[in-house]
C-alpha cells in the first residue's frame, strides 16, 4: 500500500510540474495538452493494477477452502522454494517394493516436488556391495497417514492428508527413513570398538515444506520428518590403574 501511495504522489508531482508557468511561452488561458493527461491517467491506472495484483498475504493465502476440501493451484508446484524430494502428492500409493521405490515416482496422477534426476532408493536404504555393512540398520517408507507434525517453530500442526488439484483428490506422502530398531540395542553400532567407545543408533530429522493447517488456516510450513539413522559415539572414560 505504501508503494501505491508513493506512486500516486510521484504522478501528482509530474502533473504539477507539467502546468504552464506564467512567464513561459504558453498563454495563461491555454490548458495542459490532452495527451499529457491521457499519459498521466495511464500511469495511475497501471499503478492501481499492480497494487491490486500484488499478493497481500504470504503463499498460504493461495491455499483456499476448508480443511476437508482444500483446493491448491497446480502452479504452486513449479515454485522451486516449495520443492522437496521427500514430499509427493499422488492419487495412488507410491511403489513400495525394494526394486521400484523411487523418489521421482512420476506415474499418472502424481505431482512430485522434485523435478531432478535421482537414483532409486531401496526400502532398506542405503544399499551396500557384498562385504559392506552399515553401522546402523535403517528402513525407508512412503508415509501417507501422517496427521500431525512439529513445525520449524516447535509447534504442533495438522498435516493435510488430501487436497484438491485440478478437480482431482491427491494424497500427501512423505518419504521417511528411520532406524530399523525403535530402541538402541545394548551392543551399540555395528563395527564400533565397544572397549573404547559407547555407541548407539538414533533416528535424525530434517524439515520439509508440506501443506498443513493451524487454527483453521491452511498454509505451506516446514515440518519435521525422519530422514536417516546415524551412529552416535562417545569416548569411554579411561580406567585408572
Curated annotation (Swiss-Prot):
Q: Name one GO molecular function term.
A: nerve growth factor receptor binding
Q: Which GO terms describe its biological process?
A: adult locomotory behavior; axon extension; cell population proliferation; cell proliferation in forebrain; cell surface receptor protein tyrosine kinase signaling pathway; circadian rhythm; extrinsic apoptotic signaling pathway in absence of ligand; extrinsic apoptotic signaling pathway via death domain receptors
Note the SS bond partners: 136-201, 179-229, 189-231
Which InterPro entries does this entry report, sorted A to Z?
Cystine-knot_cytokine, Nerve_growth_factor-like, Nerve_growth_factor-rel, Nerve_growth_factor_bsu, Nerve_growth_factor_bsu_mml, Nerve_growth_factor_CS
Residues engaged in binding a 1-acyl-sn-glycero-3-phospho-L-serine: 209
Q: Which UniProt keywords apply?
A: Cleavage on pair of basic residues, Disulfide bond, Endosome, Glycoprotein, Growth factor, Lipid-binding, Metalloenzyme inhibitor, Metalloprotease inhibitor, Protease inhibitor, Secreted, Signal
Q: Pfam families given for it?
A: NGF
Per the UniProt entry, the propeptide covers 19-121
Carbohydrate attachment residues? 69, 114, 166
Q: Name one GO cellular component term.
A: extracellular region
Q: Where in the cell is it found?
A: Secreted; Endosome lumen
The tissues in which it is expressed are: Detected in the granule and pyramidal cell layer in the hippocampus.
**Signal peptide as annotated in the record:** 1-18
Q: Where does a 1-acyl-sn-glycero-3-phospho-(1D-myo-inositol) bind?
A: 173, 209
What role is this protein assigned?
Nerve growth factor is important for the development and maintenance of the sympathetic and sensory nervous systems. Extracellular ligand for the NTRK1 and NGFR receptors, activates cellular signaling cascades to regulate neuronal proliferation, differentiation and survival. The immature NGF precursor (proNGF) functions as a ligand for the heterodimeric receptor formed by SORCS2 and NGFR, and activates cellular signaling cascades that lead to inactivation of RAC1 and/or RAC2, reorganization of the actin cytoskeleton and neuronal growth cone collapse.
Q: Which family is it part of?
A: Belongs to the NGF-beta family.
How does this chain assemble? Answer: Homodimer. The homodimer interacts with a single NTRK1 chain. The homodimer interacts with a single NGFR chain. The NGF dimer interacts with a single SORCS2 chain (via extracellular domain). The NGF precursor (proNGF) binds to a receptor complex formed by SORT1 and NGFR, which leads to NGF endocytosis. Both mature NGF and the immature NGF precursor (proNGF) interact with SORCS2 and with the heterodimer formed by SORCS2 and NGFR (via extracellular domains). The NGF precursor (proNGF) has much higher affinity for SORCS2 than mature NGF.
Alphabetical list of PANTHER family matching this protein: BETA-NERVE GROWTH FACTOR (PTHR11589:SF10), NERVE GROWTH FACTOR NGF -RELATED (PTHR11589)
What's the protein here called? Beta-nerve growth factor
This chain's source organism reads Rattus norvegicus
Amino acid at each position: 500500500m505504501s508503494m501505491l501511495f508513493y506512486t500516486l504522489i510521484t504522478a501528482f508531482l509530474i502533473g504539477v510540474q507539467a502546468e504552464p508557468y506564467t512567464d513561459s511561452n504558453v498563454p495563461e488561458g491555454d490548458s495542459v495538452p490532452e495527451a499529457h493527461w491521457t499519459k498521466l491517467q495511464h500511469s495511475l491506472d497501471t499503478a492501481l493494477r499492480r497494487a491490486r495484483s500484488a499478493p497481500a498475504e504470504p503463499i498460504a493465502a493461495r491455499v483456499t477452502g476448508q480443511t476437508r476440501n482444500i483446493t491448491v493451484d497446480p502452479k504452486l508446484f513449479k515454485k522451486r522454494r516449495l520443492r522437496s524430494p521427500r514430499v509427493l502428492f499422488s492419487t495412488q500409493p507410491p511403489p513400495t517394493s525394494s526394486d521400484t521405490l523411487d523418489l521421482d515416482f512420476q506415474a499418472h496422477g502424481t505431482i512430485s516436488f522434485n523435478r531432478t534426476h535421482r537414483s532409486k532408493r531401496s526400502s532398506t536404504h542405503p544399499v551396500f556391495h557384498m562385504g559392506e555393512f552399515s553401522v546402523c540398520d535403517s528402513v525407508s517408507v512412503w508415509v501417507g497417514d501422517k496427521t500431525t507434525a512439529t513445525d520449524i517453530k516447535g509447534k504442533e500442526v495438522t498435516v493435510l492428508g488430501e487436497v484438491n488439484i485440478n478437480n482431482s483428490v491427491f494424497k500427501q506422502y512423505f518419504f521417511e527413513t528411520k532406524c530399523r530398531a525403535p530402541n538402541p540395542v545394548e551392543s551399540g553400532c555395528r563395527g564400533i570398538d565397544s572397549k573404547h567407545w559407547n555407541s548407539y543408533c538414533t533416528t535424525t530429522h530434517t524439515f520439509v515444506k508440506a501443506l498443513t493447517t493451524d487454527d483453521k488456516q491452511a498454509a505451506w510450513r516446514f515440518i519435521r520428518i525422519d530422514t536417516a539413522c546415524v551412529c552416535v559415539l562417545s569416548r569411554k572414560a579411561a580406567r585408572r590403574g
